[in-house]
Amino acid sequence: MRATKIVATLGPSTDADAVMRALFEAGVDVFRLNASHGTQDDHARRIKKVRELEAEFKRHSGILLDLQGPKIRLGTFKDGPQFLKDESVFTITTERVEGTADIASTSYPDFARDVKTGDSVLLADGALHLQVIESDGVAARCRVVHGGMISDRKGINLPGVKVSTPSLSKKDVADAHFGVEQGVDFLALSFVRQARDVLRLRHLLEDAEAKQPIIAKIEKPEGWQNLDSILEECDGVMVARGDLGVEMALEKVPAIQKTIIEKARARGRFVITATQMLESMIESPLPTRAEVSDVANAIHDGTSAVMLSAETSAGKHPIEAVRMMARIACETETSIQQQGFLSAWETQAQSIPEIIADAAYHCARTAGVVALAVGTTSGSSARLLARYRPPVPVFAFTSNENVARQLSIVYGVDAIVTSGMTSTDQMLTEMEHLLVSTSRAKPGDNIVFVAGQPVGLRGSTNMLKLHRVAGIR
């Protein structure tokens, strides 16, 4: 069983029923909807299709709605794309104008108040570099340091500038409510700068009586600097290397990625590594060798999941991209287990559930077991076990379909929905039956059984049993 989860972004390239079915068969664990593109009707249609495939394949998949966030963009250009020459002057204004090679508007009303003389302005993901000459609070005149083609609604990045945009725009609030109504399983918050950004979204969800896990996207220098406090408030993080690599020096991104993964794992947070993982497969049926190494290295770092963006949403080979990512993950995991690269997180257990998880991991390493079977109400026990990166699958048994879907992102966890159970004996009997009947275990195999007493009480994990499978009764 592949332990590293695959997140695939849906879009025009995946809308055909046959493609969606093939993605499901290829092993996508979580389907991502990018709120920056498409309409709510588009996303609702895709959500409906994922749920239909879930029922058909009898396998739970997560749906992640990625909120756009306060992305700063240029306006539109009167005569189409324009070429900005090196050393020319280009003005960015908060007033509405039709763009030319000399001036363009911006969607961000405080742009000219936030920047000052000498600040860098990067356009189109860093392809063009401007430097502010002067700003009067309405418009900023900029020298074109490195020019190029520019077109409608290209992104603006302001490295080193503390922008005053709110963490949640009106569009984000509307999209978050839409996601809750549609029953998505995760919400990703873009351009997180500090812990209170996460708390704003958390409070919005609480007001709606919703409990979707929040993924903090680390893509701003402030988010990187405040990582520890952000990790305290979020449920998972995304290493969003696109904007991160624009606003910070590119050569720093690999080390930042490793640190984010390490710290997230230490706190028991799942982590998604994203952006340009198999970028060449937007056009090519095969990735570059460097891209294969990039995916493998993220898995060596300990990421919970790897993500495909335009490769699946707009690329020519979405199915091949997922299959390739799955093959890379399986091969890398085999290498890791053989060579012991990915060790358990060495930490001092602080609670009874942590002590049980630590003991279960060591049983998995030394007792010849084929699986860890855990009964879970909220999913927390399964997430604790996954933190240790055990060498065998974690089968999480829960009576809650939402919990099963939320575990779809967690490394090494396969969630199975069961009926409600009233005792650990009943739980073990049903687990054993399901594992054998689905060929996940066979009579004579050893498994580690983890549960809590009293059954059904959140956070009650307090027992471990090394159990030999007897077979179907």
Predicted regions and their residues:
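Non-catalytic helical/linker scaffolds that mediate oligomerization, partner binding
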Residues: 1-473
